[in-house]
Amino acid sequence: MKVHLDRTSSGFCIGVQGTIHLAEEKLEELDSKLYCLGDIVHNEVEVKRLEDLGLITIDNEEYNKLKHAHVLVRAHGEPPSTYKRADSNELSITDSTCPVVSKLQRTARLLFELGFQIIIYGKKTHPEVIGINGQCADQAVIIKHADLSVPEETDPIDFTRQTALISQTTMDVPGFYILKKNLESLFADRTDAAEQKSTHSWKTIRDIDITAEMTGICPLPDLVYKDTICRQVSSRNAKLHDFAAANDIIIFVAGKKSSNGQVLFNICRESNPRSYFIADQTGLQDEWFYDNGRPVGSVGVCGATSTPMWLLENVAHSIEQTYAG
């Protein structure tokens, strides 16, 4: 049995790497406690490792009561209200918001200030989406289902307003464009036939287009979209698909809360039905590794952007020691 560890399309993305590195630095240099608002990463094993080093995870209620303390803002980012509370409670903020998320927040804020209705492709309760929505005074329309199958998600849309479609950075690219197409049809259905072609043709925009609108040089169309999905994350999809197909079985390692983990695991399972989701090596099951009593030929170990490489290495080592010996 050969055990293959995916080192090219698994493990922390740059944003999470920066957050973990900053947390470790602060834990080493601070004499006082370091708090983190929410799980620093959606991986229970990594959270426990950092908590063992002294990191204290708190929720919003605890954060609002905290005073004169050091707080880490994780890669997902936070809404403006979090920073206002920090000022009023004299909190010292270490901001590790992912640069890709920071750019997205700025885009959402500028479009909202220009009067656009903001539609976010994402999950309403995901911390990144909460942060983006905060840039829009919590008035964004949030749609998780690209097929528009949930009326409660589309009911808040005002079809008379200028509208901008953006996305949570970790959503799937095909889903974003399916949503765009379905929204085009929905907007067309809600308007007069005479207006459909001219007013309700969706146009992609760049940062320079937003600047041009702000300065009055070139007004934006009524309906615009900006693909804000992180390509470092989405580019892993094809690589993981091929990796999964090249092995007899796949052991996918991720936290239960990881949105990206669910997306990537589904990609693995579509490519290889013998794909199994675990949090760590304790989740391994003997029957996965045998065909008619004989060991399988190859095992692929991979994971999410929130899965640390050290954990993937531990899982691969455990498989080698237990099943490949």
Swiss-Prot record:
The metabolic or biological pathway listed in the UniProt record of this protein is: Isoprenoid biosynthesis; dimethylallyl diphosphate biosynthesis; dimethylallyl diphosphate from (2E)-4-hydroxy-3-methylbutenyl diphosphate: step 1/1; Isoprenoid biosynthesis; isopentenyl diphosphate biosynthesis via DXP pathway; isopentenyl diphosphate from 1-deoxy-D-xylulose 5-phosphate: step 6/6
Required co-factor? [4Fe-4S] cluster
List of catalytic residues: E128 (proton donor)
Catalysed reaction, written as an equation: isopentenyl diphosphate + 2 oxidized [2Fe-2S]-[ferredoxin] + H2O = (2E)-4-hydroxy-3-methylbut-2-enyl diphosphate + 2 reduced [2Fe-2S]-[ferredoxin] + 2 H(+); dimethylallyl diphosphate + 2 oxidized [2Fe-2S]-[ferredoxin] + H2O = (2E)-4-hydroxy-3-methylbut-2-enyl diphosphate + 2 reduced [2Fe-2S]-[ferredoxin] + 2 H(+)
Chain positions recorded as [4Fe-4S] cluster binding sites: C13, C98, C230
- Keywords in alphabetical order: 4Fe-4S, Iron, Iron-sulfur, Isoprene biosynthesis, Metal-binding, Oxidoreductase
Q: Which Gene3D superfamilies match?
A: 3.40.50.11270, 4-hydroxy-3-methylbut-2-enyl diphosphate reductase, catalytic domain (3.40.1010.20)
Disulfide-bonded cysteines: none
Q: State where (2E)-4-hydroxy-3-methylbut-2-enyl diphosphate binds.
A: H42, H76, H126, T169, S258, S259, N260, S306
The protein, known as: 4-hydroxy-3-methylbut-2-enyl diphosphate reductase
What organism is the protein native to? Chlorobium phaeobacteroides (strain BS1)
